[in-house]
């Protein structure tokens, strides 16, 4: 009965915090499916809050944000992104904490961070100030946009994430590089190129973050850099080509949306990337860094070395390495430890009750984990990871609500374990009569 009441309370709490905004508010709910259309392609000034429903600061900001949206209605657009649900949008704009507020002005691909007060009045003042600046820029002929003609591409945030290439810089940057390059050949007057620009810029940012710069997106003005256009037979715009070290360039014939481009880039990355490292948990830095820098970290707790020997342990590690390679496109972190070596970690993840080996996958951002309940085999682990990759499977909060303490220890030396040597006790001076008296 207590569990039922607790479950109802939890559900009520979840519904409350997940509904910070509704369709009846003047705050426009933004998602990956409408963000580009509503914000990036809009001529309006936008204030966008990136929030998480469980965030206390976000909950306190909500009434003030609604108040500002009502006051600015038909003057400035006010939106909100559930960045906990739509992590791709948050990642695209470098959101690392909640709430984060960004102002999308003339240059939609280079929003400014809002650092003002959290009251409705302060938000409105900042919006009107940004609006005045936008109007002044337009009067002065400075659109600041990514698509502002022949020079517009180089003046936007794409200058950082979309690499502008020329006849002089192409070979050094692309052909001499170990990285994978996706290069768009465009003409400034081309309508299809203009439509592609925001998608290409958004994809460049996401790909850069997800591949750690190993896949790069670039652009070449083919009307200016005619040597390159001739070399690669560019006859229509836009033309996108993929360049990989030691291979002939191939045409990209996929979709023109951000998600299509990112998906292809990640495929290229996984095809060329080495398998992720499988690290032993020997200190807190390794454990926390691996989990905090990846969407998920997979933690395996293997039997004690005395139970398996080096051969048995290595067979487990081989299975883990094989699966790490199979799922490398996910860019998860991979960790392992020995049973009993990290008691607090095991306790926080509820590991040990089913015996060893055991496995859990941790989302350090949400402090939740999923536990492998099937067999610790290649097939069993693969089914577990496949469910996780589709966002399925049951999860639970990490015990204690924070990352558990890690006990420093020496790394495994790759050898069989040895039983501790018992000290020989000299009993020659001990009289048996005395022992009998002690026992009594």
From Swiss-Prot:
UniProt xrefs under Pfam families: Thioredox_PDIA6_C, Thioredoxin
Residue numbers annotated as active site: 55, 58, 190, 193
Keyword set, alphabetical order: Calcium, Cell membrane, Chaperone, Disulfide bond, Endoplasmic reticulum, Isomerase, Membrane, Phosphoprotein, Redox-active center, Repeat, Signal
Compositional bias (Acidic residues): 419-440
Disulfide bonds: 55-58, 190-193
GO cellular component: endoplasmic reticulum; endoplasmic reticulum chaperone complex; endoplasmic reticulum lumen; endoplasmic reticulum-Golgi intermediate compartment; extracellular space; melanosome; plasma membrane; smooth endoplasmic reticulum
Transmembrane segments: none
Chain positions of motif Prevents secretion from ER: 437-440
Gene Ontology biological process: IRE1-mediated unfolded protein response; negative regulation of IRE1-mediated unfolded protein response; platelet activation; platelet aggregation; protein folding; response to endoplasmic reticulum stress
Leader sequence segment: 1-19
Keyword Transport tagged: no
Known EC number: 5.3.4.1
Residues covered by the Thioredoxin domain: 21-133, 151-287
Site positions for Lowers pKa of C-terminal Cys of first active site: 118
Catalysed transformations (reactions): Catalyzes the rearrangement of -S-S- bonds in proteins
GO molecular function: calcium ion binding; protein disulfide isomerase activity; protein-disulfide reductase activity
Subcellular location: Endoplasmic reticulum lumen; Cell membrane; Melanosome
Domain of life: Eukaryota
Marked site: Contributes to redox potential value: 56-57, 191-192
Basic and acidic residues composition bias: residue spans: 152-161
Residues with site note (Lowers pKa of C-terminal Cys of second active site): 256
Similarity-based family: Belongs to the protein disulfide isomerase family.
Its job: May function as a chaperone that inhibits aggregation of misfolded proteins. Negatively regulates the unfolded protein response (UPR) through binding to UPR sensors such as ERN1, which in turn inactivates ERN1 signaling. May also regulate the UPR via the EIF2AK3 UPR sensor. Plays a role in platelet aggregation and activation by agonists such as convulxin, collagen and thrombin.
Record note on quaternary structure: Part of a large chaperone multiprotein complex comprising DNAJB11, HSP90B1, HSPA5, HYOU, PDIA2, PDIA4, PDIA6, PPIB, SDF2L1, UGGT1 and very small amounts of ERP29, but not, or at very low levels, CALR nor CANX. Interacts with MICA on the surface of tumor cells, leading to MICA disulfide bond reduction which is required for its release from tumor cells. Interacts with ITGB3 following platelet stimulation. Interacts with ERN1; the interaction is direct. Interacts with EIF2AK3.
Protein name: Protein disulfide-isomerase A6
The gene coding this protein: Pdia6
